[in-house]
Amino acid sequence: MRILVNGEGADVRGAQNVAELIDGYRMPPQAVLVEHNGVALHRREWRERALAEGDRIEIIHVVAGG
């Protein structure tokens, strides 16, 4: 299945939902913000949010600093 991740085409055959997509990128979930088709998601929604052909995902990796 092809989707857009941060504006670039991505083949995500193994990911059925947002949680599996994030797992595939090996990002710590507590440090990631996700938007799915223009809707910001809470982490508890990731497993419930199925991916479909053509979806748009924005992933923001939050880094602490000062």
Name what the model sees in each region.
Residues 1-65:
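Ubiquitin-like/PB1-type beta-grasp interaction modules and other compact soluble beta-rich domains
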